[in-house]
Design a protein with these regions (language model features):
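Conserved N-terminal beta1-alpha1 strand-loop-helix module at the mouth
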Residues: 1-92, 96, 105-133, 149-155, ...
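A short, flexible beta-alpha/helix-coil linker loop
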Residues: 140-142
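Glycine/threonine-rich flexible loop motifs
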Residues: 144-146
């Protein structure tokens, strides 16, 4: 699978007032390219159930080979889901979670392993042989991850992009109006939680974000406007 970080949805049951799989289906149908299931409140069995439903709706949209489905932190859940026949593409972990080399050992070379990082020192020192991308943030303070640290400026993100040997996806309170400046940093994409999962109309919110990102990337590259069709 070719990993596309352009539009990355992070979602769990506590983020939604509707079915998680319905929000995922709407977002993926509108152009989101990566989905991470994250929850700090539900148990392993419910996480596996959510993964199964997410994998099903992604498959029904014909995007199992182009939209990665990841699990936050829970290597055990990813492995158990795979044992149950669910297509899980990998995990995303933080600095205090299971080491990336352990994730790589158990998931295999063809799986995706993402790592949270927000300083030049961490990104420069990371063993990139075990990691596929860095998750960077927060761009703004956000209620969905209170321990995310201090907000990063666009200037700081630009510096992180320059020192990184891997693709970077940036999130933390990201809104559509942030995307032109974010695209200009050279980041490979954005991730959101509440901007889609907590929206009154998740489909419309997803469409607006995808359109804004495509337009912003085109403008940063000096291309004409290119609204998605």
């Amino acid at each position: 699978m070719k990993l596309d970080l352009s539009a990355y949805l992070v979602i769990g049951p506590e983020n939604c007032s509707r079915l998680v799989e319905d929000v995922i289906a709407a977002a993926v149908d509108e152009g989101f390219t990566c989905v991470q299931i994250r929850s700090k409140v539900v148990g392993a069995r419910e996480m596996i159930s959510v993964l199964e439903k997410a994998a099903q709706v992604i498959d029904e949209l014909g995007k199992s080979d182009s939209v990665a489905l990841l699990v936050n932190d829970r290597l055990d859940v990813a492995l158990a889901a795979r044992e149950a026949g669910i297509k899980v593409d990998g995990v995303h972990v933080g600095q205090s979670d299971i080491p990336v080399e352990v994730c790589r050992k158990f998931l295999g070379a063809d799986s995706i392993v993402g790592l949270s990082a927000n300083t030049e020192e961490i990104i420069s020192a990371a063993d990139v042989s075990c990691v596929d991308y860095f998750g960077v943030g927060p761009l703004h303070a956000t209620d969905t991850k209170s321990d995310a640290g201090a907000a990063l400026s666009f200037e700081k993100i630009s510096k992180l992009v320059k020192v990184s040997r891997l693709p970077l996806v940036v999130g933390g309170g990201v809104k559509a109006e942030d995307l032109p400046a974010l695209a200009a940093t050279g980041a490979n994409g954005f991730f959101v939680v509440s901007a889609v999962a907590g929206a009154d109309n998740p489909r419309r919110a997803a469409r607006e974000l995808v359109d804004a990102w495509i337009l912003s990337v085109d403008n940063s590259a000096g291309k004409p406007y290119n609204l998605r069709g």
